[in-house]
Amino acid sequence: MGHAISSLAVALGCVFFLGGFAWGAYVYQPYTVPTDSMAPTVGAGERVLAQRIGGEDVRRGDVVVFEDPGWGDLPMLKRVVAVGGDRVECCDDQGRLSVNGRALDEPYVSGRGPASPVEFTARVPRDGLFLLGDKRDSSLDSREHLDDAHQGSVGRDTVRARVDATVWPFGSAGAVVRPEGFREMPGGVSRPGPWNAVLWTCGAGAALILAGAVYGPFARRGGRRGSP
């Protein structure tokens, strides 16, 4: 009986663990952050998981992975601060970024200075996204492309994924929080992906495998002791 319970626990554990792993691999794409332009949210060299989504699912405040030939040959990570039809400008008399006249508090921005060391105003075209790094004093982002035809915006179709969590190094691992400042704006903020569910599924599977592997020898030993 003990052997059957042990085998069942290991089998179920394998199902949960492999199923969770496959689920995560289907939903998420891992990326290594190449620069510190998104510090302190994610730093250079950190490993993140980005949920595969289409551009139509992007909301203000999302940290996205995108590819635009006009910005370079490699995928880039930036934060969406404005979407199609928005007017974005910086800075007000308190040094804050404004979207459609609404000033934003941005606790994720690195440093204590203004939201941007360079003042700017831009109108985001339809199906466009205006992107800024969280380390505003050194990030190369939409501000570097204000003279382009789309005033620094990229198309929604350039988005490949949305960053949901940091997974390496372990000391900085955790979910990327959706900014409260954008919550009351039209469209609100995006919902977190299934990161926690994937993690718990894999964890439950690993726990069942371990419990079954440990319980089996004890059950067999107990059976031998009880035999005549």
Feature map (PLM): residue ranges:
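Extended hydrophobic leader/signal-anchor segments used for secretion and membrane insertion
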Residues: 1-228
